Curated annotation (Swiss-Prot):
Pfam families: Peptidase_M90 (PF06167). This is Mlc titration factor A. Involved in the modulation of the activity of the glucose-phosphotransferase system (glucose-PTS). Interacts with the transcriptional repressor Mlc, preventing its interaction with DNA and leading to the modulation of expression of genes regulated by Mlc, including ptsG, which encodes the PTS system glucose-specific EIICB component. Shows zinc-dependent metallopeptidase activity. The gene is mtfA. It is an enzyme of class 3 (hydrolase). One of its GO terms (cellular component) is cytosol. Belongs to the MtfA family.
Amino acid sequence: MIKWPWKNSQPQVQTLEHWQAAISIPLLAPLSDEERQKLVTLADQFLKQKRLIPLQELVLTEIMQQRIALLFSLPVLSLGIDALDGFHEVLVYPGPFIVEEEWQDDIGLVHTGKMVQSGQSWDQGPIVLNWQEVQDSFDLSGFNLIIHEVAHKLDIRSSGEATGVPLIPLRDIAVWEQHLHGAMDALQEEIDLVGEEAASMDPYAVHDPAECFAVLSEYFFSAPELLDERFPDLYRCFQKFYRQDPLARLKSWQSSVNYRAPSIY
């Protein structure tokens, strides 16, 4: 077995004080003190294992790097840092970026052209982000660019390609697919009825099962009450896979005497 020099089997415990400014965002406010400590330890490991590469003259300050690492670590809080082994680099643009892409239309014709992207997750390569929308991921709105791309990487770990079914026990796959496709069908019906702009959730979820898993993972962590209300069975599937219960965490925080959403700066 090869031992990579940057992998530390005994991660150092990071002090919350050093990460206090970075962790003070609404998305992470519901975490308990124990979860916060675990999260910053994972985030520190992340920064030691991955290269953050700013593009187009973007300057990544320490707090920017810490917040990127914290958001990458949140979905794997219980899965562990090894769940993020599928990449070594994170490329960060200042804003949405243009890429040359191929796509197939409804009748099978292949087209090539320039497309604006928010982020990308290559099957055997880096994750690409844009800082503008990373900043939009700090709240509890249901949108989270980093969690979306992490979900794709977790999906790919299962079979080598993104199918919408991450690494779960074989006995759970049929139920998972049933609820995932059920959510896609329900969202498509809603879109057909009220249109994409008025839909209750991001219409990109109906694109394919892989995108549905990624989009609804965003809601699982940043708007769990909406996912649980719309698709409670799927929420429980996600809860079992991620080994977290963001809704219970959110309710506990909201009922606490210290309930106060932090300001983002």
